[in-house]
Amino acid sequence: MLANRANRLVLKRLVHLNTSNIIKPICSYRSLASSSKSKTQFTKKPPISEFSIDEILEHFILKKKTIEGKENKDKNTIKVEKVNTKIDRFSSEVIIKEKNKKNNNIEDEDEFGIEEMIAKNNNNNNNPNNNNNNNNTKKVPTFNRFSTEVIVKSNNNNINEFENEEITKNNLNKKAPKFNRSSSGVVINTTSNDNNNDKNNNEFENEEIMLNSGKTNKKASKMDRYSSEVIIKEKNNEEILVNNNNNNNNNTTTTTNNNNNNKASKMERYSSEVIIKEKKDNNNDIEKDDIEKDEIIVNIMNGFEDKDESAVEFLKRHRIEHQVPKSTIYLKEKTMEEDEMVRKRLSVNRDNINFSNNKNRKQIFTKKNHQNGAGILPKGLANNIVKNDWMKRQMTDPYVAMAQKNDLISRAAYKIINIDEQIQLFKPGQIVVDLGAAPGGWSKYIQERVTNRGLVISVDTSSNFQLDKDCFIHGDFTLTETQNKIFELTKFKSLNDLKLYKHSLIHSDSKIQNLIENGGANGNGSGNGDLQKQPIDNMFKQKSACYVDVVVSDMAPSYSGLQQVDHSRLIDLQRLALFFAFKTLKKGGTFVCKVSRGGEEKKFFKLLESNFISVKSMKPGASRSESTEIYYIGKNYIGK
């Protein structure tokens, strides 16, 4: 009972001390349980009589001390919260601890906090604009995203010129550009190590750092997609050496390099290694570049016929100003050579081709020679030079190259050559009608096959016929007028007879003139007088017309671009050619025509089968794979 009374008296005295905050932990058994080591001791509510007065007083003293300590800390934190800033996205606990240690004269346990506070105090003392700095500390940018440990350490190395300037600039950066994604530690370590070198290095680095920090930070350009670590190392290790060499040799080159550094805009997507190597090559290998320029100018001049001094000067200026690469010059030389070769091939007289030797003809027109050939230009070169798709196709077509080499008029001649090689259409002494003959590729080959004992009559509505026009008729074959001209030419039956007739019109034969003057073959004037009344050409006109052996048709209408329309028009045109063949062909004759796939060609094929003993369809090797054209060959015409 006495113990309980004593405890109650102590509690009453505590109430008079206005320490109501202390009463709660003392009176509650839970707080005592938390202060003890084991919580299992207080499973039940203990009576107050079990605690002695000494224990209660000890708890009271401890709690009082802890509360006083918390009040002191709260006072300190209140002072700091007024000046608290978002310095480095780190908590201000380290700074507060270091302030407390400094006020209480405690030894330095954390070097980072004390050094950082000293650095900031020094900066505030050195800079006259302390008010501006204090205002700026309220809006310190999120600059580095890393700790300022390296910055503070580098400040202690007595390198005040660069670092003080950089710290002030960093404090003044209100917009806080996201400049380096790498740590600032690398930047400052490299600069601090380089500052221990010679004065020449320090001059270059200070200029470069001022440019990088002063200009590029304001614009906040996307300077490097690479880390700044590589750029700074390469610049410090390689570019400084280049600039030192240039300073010793040429004073002018340093100014140009500084101007180029001011324009460091489009540096991304390339590493600094390439830039530094190019600077070395441009500065150290000037003589090599001049030699290469002279060689390139000589190569350009080799392609021109006129080698005047004005042209040389123009090319030199063109080379120095625009810096033409070697690849374009190579292409220009090749194209000029190819143009000369094409001009030479086109200038050849196409009439002076002779296939009199049968062996030579087989060497030119066999399948092996023109099946896997090359075009006039390689495909890669043609794609770089020629823009027109049709010209690209022509320049890379092997049959075009073969036609120029063998002095043929067009590549279409190889179509009839392929058909003749397989079916053997033509023989010497035949009469052939070529419908749609212009420009004369088929007619030239067929005339060589039938020889001068045969005859090829060429008909076309176009006047672009590049052969001798003695056997050419300009007109529409469906008209009776042109058909009569064709029948008149068939009276000659051979090319030799036709040439003799043309020659007689120009230079009359002396024997014929004597017969006309004497009135007869005996010279007595008692002849029948037919030669006197009739002109000279009636001698050939007395011959009767004959039917032809072969009718070929490579005609095509003007294309509209609509596949079905063009197909039906082509079938109609070849049907007219077939009706013409019915009039002119002899029994056992041959008909060759071009059609396209589209549906209507099947009916036309059946029409051929009803008039010819054998009918074949064929796609020549010279016909392009993307084309829908095919050729129908009807042999052994039945006749009426």
UniProtKB/Swiss-Prot annotation:
One of its GO terms (cellular component) is mitochondrion. One of its GO terms (biological process) is RNA methylation. Residues 180-192 have a biased composition (Polar residues). Residues 1-31 form a transit peptide. It holds the Pfam family FtsJ. It is found in: Mitochondrion. Its EC number is 2.1.1.-. S-adenosyl-L-methionine binds at P439, G440, G441, W442, D460, D476, F477, D554. S-adenosyl-L-methionine-dependent 2'-O-ribose methyltransferase that catalyzes the formation of a 2'-O-methyluridine in the mitochondrial large subunit ribosomal RNA (mtLSU rRNA), a universally conserved modification in the peptidyl transferase domain of the mtLSU rRNA. This is rRNA methyltransferase 2, mitochondrial. It comes from Dictyostelium discoideum.
